[in-house]
Regions:
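C-terminal substrate-binding subdomain of Rossmann-fold SDR/epimerase-dehydratase oxidoreductases
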Residues: 95, 101-245
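Active-site loop immediately N-terminal to the catalytic Tyr-X3-Lys motif
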Residues: 78, 90-91, 136
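Structural element of the ATP-grasp superfamily
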Residues: 11, 64, 97, 190-191
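Gly/Ser/Thr-rich beta-alpha loop segments that engage phosphate groups in nucleotides
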Residues: 9, 36, 56, 87, ...
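Active-site proximal helix/loop that lines the substrate pocket
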Residues: 29-32, 82-88, 114, 134, ...
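N-terminal Rossmann-like NAD(P)+-binding domain of SDR-like oxidoreductases, especially those catalyzing
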Residues: 1-83, 152, 208, 213-218, ...
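Conserved active-site region of classical short-chain dehydrogenase/reductase
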Residues: 5-13, 91, 123-126, 130
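The catalytic Tyr-centered alpha-helix of NAD(P)H-dependent dehydrogenases
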Residues: 49-56, 86, 90-94, 118-122
């Protein structure tokens, strides 16, 4: 949270105080909107962050918009759905399932497993960011999504099927505190105004991602500590300073 809030503020101040003529792309998150049972959030919908992380990201968004309006900084905000792909940190949902299943460990699913996330392959997200950097309008917000909505349990089952692992590896565990039910973004703005659309199918991207983790143990193994791979990491004791960084 410290990096998100003070880091964003420091960057904005540095640009303002040095009269730098540069464009800032502030990469936010769909979590600033909170969950939604029906429909999808648009860029001008009210923010209702439900976690400390989401609240800090929403605050950073407000800083960016304020500096654009007050000081004329060339700032654009993007809000993207859940990313997946190579080099994602092992604590994240998809990498954790792949790694634990590959090790023959139980695959933890929070609560009922019915929570829904909209997934986007990392390369689609990167191409959207590049397009916004080049052609986006200053002071605007752009939602980025691929409309690949799946329940968490379905994602786990798909991964196990691709890996030829048994479904009995799935283990339902205590739900995460403040676990939002469903995220969904309306990305019609970037599609219409900047002619962006996702290129990669979900199934192909998931297969590529699994293959990457299986072939690149050298990268993730030093990161995949017992704490990182823990089924319910929020119950563990963490260094308070690191959590605030």
């Amino acid at each position: 949270m410290k990096v998100i809030l003070l880091g964003t503020f420091n960057i904005l101040e540095a640009i303002r105080n040095n009269n730098l003529n540069i464009r800032i792309i502030h990469v936010s998150t769909d979590e600033v909107y909170s969950d939604i049972l029906n429909g999808s959030y648009k860029e001008d919908d009210r923010l209702k962050p439900s976690s400390p992380y989401a609240a800090s990201k929403a605050s950073a968004d407000m800083f960016c918009l304020a500096y654009h309006r007050t000081y004329g900084l060339n700032v654009i905000i993007t809000r993207c759905s859940n990313n997946f792909g190579p080099y994602q940190f092992p604590e994240k949902f998809i990498p954790k399932i792949i790694i634990r299943a590959n090790m023959g460990l139980k695959v933890p699913i929070y609560g009922s497993g019915k929570n829904i996330r909209d997934w986007i392959y990392v390369l689609d997200h990167c191409e959207a960011l590049d397009l916004i950097l080049k052609n986006g309008k200053s002071g605007e917000i752009y939602n980025i999504s691929s409309n690949n909505e799946f329940e968490n349990i379905k994602i786990a089952e798909m991964i196990l099927d691709i890996m030829n692992k048994p479904k009995d590896l799935i283990e339902f565990v205590e739900d995460r505190p403040g676990h939002d039910i469903r995220y969904s973004l309306d990305s019609s703005k970037i599609r219409k105004e900047l002619n962006w659309k996702p290129k990669y199918s979900f199934k192909e991207s998931l297969e590529k991602t699994i293959e990457w983790y299986l072939n690149n143990e050298w990268w993730w193994k030093p990161l995949a500590t017992e704490k990182i791979l823990h089924p319910t990491p929020w119950k563990l004791k963490w260094d308070t300073l690191s959590l605030l960084s």
